[in-house]
Amino acid sequence: MPTTFQEIPRERPVTPLLDRADTPAGLRRLAEADLETLADELRQELLYTVGQTGGHFGAGLGVIELTIALHYVFDTPDDRLVWDVGHQAYPHKILTGRRNRMLSLRQKDGIAAFPRRSESEYDTFGVGHSSTSISAALGMAIAARLQNSARKSIAVIGDGALTAGMAFEALNHAQEVNADMLVILNDNDMSISRNVGGLSNYLAKILSSRTYASMREGSKKVLSRLPGAWEIARRTEEYAKGMLVPGTLFEELGWNYIGPIDGHDLPTMIATLRNMRDLKGPQFLHVVTKKGKGFAPAEIDPIGYHAITKLEPADKPAAPKKASGPKYSAVFGQWLCDMAAADNRLVGITPAMKEGSDLVDFSERYPERYFDVAIAEQHAVTLAAGMACEGSKPVVAIYSTFLQRAYDQLIHDVAVQNLDVLFAIDRAGLVGEDGPTHAGSYDLSYLRCIPGMLVMTPSDENELRKMLSTGHLYNGPAAVRYPRGTGPNAPISGDLQPLEIGKGVVRRQGEKVALLVFGVQLAEAMQVAEQINATVVDMRFVKPLDEALVLELAGSHELLVTIEENAIMGGAGAAVGEFLASQAVLKPLLHLGLPDIYVEHAKPAQMLAECGLDAAGIEASVKARMARLGL
């Protein structure tokens, strides 16, 4: 196996067994004695594939043996296999007829980064967000019962995803209806960032405790049929502790708990799954794996190797670096530390995205004011509300797509009470290769309808910093949404001064056409304006809208064009149209934004071009409307 990033194979490895097992039917024709060799080949294939395309890396390496065992024992796709999140699903894709398409992974018109029902009958449930698998598999199990079907339902969930309340809601309901289903806990002590909280510590005790306890009866029944396995388990103190601690938790929830077992021991896993396959009622198998298994750097640094970029050919000269500014996330991270130094009321909250949201420095400098609540978005928002009630100034750093999961808490717990909570909304707009499940396409629409909410859209790095200060000092709930990636390298002011609320800025004066920009498309709008001599306005605020400026522009221009990287329906452009209608102002409007579709995965630039939000697309749309109006 490779021991460095540079040693990842750049040519497809020789895989005689995998060549015969590119579907589960082919896999099940292999002798069980060949499966460990198959696992080695599949791991090499995964290293090669992700090296060519980039993508999620460590999670898939950790479930090679588990994936083989599941497809070997269960009759997929008739038996329903549901993966949680989907980071670990690449080996599943390779074994289910998509090996020859894996080099199109995460690319335009290629296969998706996550399981998709439209892509394969083996992808029984579309995922991307965490903690949904048990609910989905339970629904499938109940449907099978109603249809008098003997098909099995299996959910594979990581220990990180198990921290979310939704997972426990499903566990509780499954025992209530006595569903015939299997939940497999893939325990690698990781989600994306290292797990936190009581449950993670609870499970971690299986590897450290010296407490001895008798084995659970359910485990004994299964493992006693495995040659040698019961004797090994009997002698293993970690196993004994696992039966006492995690077993108690899940048994109390009404599940028959088995484990923990070694998730890289194929014979034991296959035998255990066979024994559990026909057991009635809710079954829970605890499997311990190592994220990044088989690639030493990923085993040592599972956070850093959660995902990787594609390898460039060894003989390819390095491309000259384009001048660009810092990442928007980095601008936020620096502002957070600066404001924390100036205001000791500030606290930072994240739902398991410390690295992605650039909170590492803050967490080290202000550990007592940093709170990683794990994958628990609803809790994160209401936690912030409680802190705000007592005079703290919480900043919730969260991806746009994940804030959707806490919408009720945002309204009921924060906005209705007019609490001082700032939402730093990262990954707004189109995010690229992860596709529609991770796109931040709707936040302007679902935020601007909330009474009292301050909603801001920065056009560059400096605007982001100023808006964060504005939101922090605002009396009430505030949101700043910013995209993935780097800015245009605007000079950044070091101060913490706020903006005047509800006031846009005219960046270029032109004639006839006014481009009203909400967000980072300002640079593209300026390019277009040079071609058609248009006025360009950085609107800054979606709510409150700069109504006086909108009226002024409507009175002095023949066409108003709104530009945003958000759904057109209900977005910032709709706010402009609604206001003009309320004032009985009839003015031609053109709304440019995300269409009423799910924009499929591709490079961000390709996605923007597809939506007409690059400079060429904006220019073409505006010129077409001008022609229709005779301008």
Swiss-Prot record:
Any idea which UniProt keywords this protein has?
Answer: Isoprene biosynthesis, Magnesium, Metal-binding, Thiamine biosynthesis, Thiamine pyrophosphate, Transferase
Q: In which pathway does it act?
A: Metabolic intermediate biosynthesis; 1-deoxy-D-xylulose 5-phosphate biosynthesis; 1-deoxy-D-xylulose 5-phosphate from D-glyceraldehyde 3-phosphate and pyruvate: step 1/1
Q: Which GO terms describe its biological process?
A: 1-deoxy-D-xylulose 5-phosphate biosynthetic process; isopentenyl diphosphate biosynthetic process, methylerythritol 4-phosphate pathway; terpenoid biosynthetic process; thiamine biosynthetic process
- Kindly indicate whether the keyword Magnesium belongs to this entry: yes
Q: Could you say which residues bind Mg(2+) here? A: 159, 188
Provide the cofactor note recorded for this chain's UniProt entry. Binds 1 Mg(2+) ion per subunit.
What the entry lists under Pfam families is as follows: DXP_synthase_N, Transket_pyr, Transketolase_C
Q: For this UniProt entry, what's an example GO CC term?
A: cytosol
Broad EC category: transferase
**Reactions that this protein is recorded to catalyse:** D-glyceraldehyde 3-phosphate + pyruvate + H(+) = 1-deoxy-D-xylulose 5-phosphate + CO2
Enzyme nomenclature, EC number:
2.2.1.7
Q: Which residues bind thiamine diphosphate?
A: 87, 128-130, 160-161, 188, 295, 377
**Entry-linked Gene3D superfamilies:** 3.40.50.920, 3.40.50.970
Keyword Lipoprotein among UniProt keywords = no
GO function terms (MF aspect): 1-deoxy-D-xylulose-5-phosphate synthase activity; magnesium ion binding; thiamine pyrophosphate binding
Cofactor(s) annotated in UniProt? Mg(2+); thiamine diphosphate
Which domain of life, per UniProt?
A: Bacteria
The Swiss-Prot or TrEMBL record describes its family as follows: Belongs to the transketolase family. DXPS subfamily.
State what this protein does.
Catalyzes the acyloin condensation reaction between C atoms 2 and 3 of pyruvate and glyceraldehyde 3-phosphate to yield 1-deoxy-D-xylulose-5-phosphate (DXP).
Q: How does it assemble?
A: Homodimer.
| Name under which the protein is recorded | 1-deoxy-D-xylulose-5-phosphate synthase
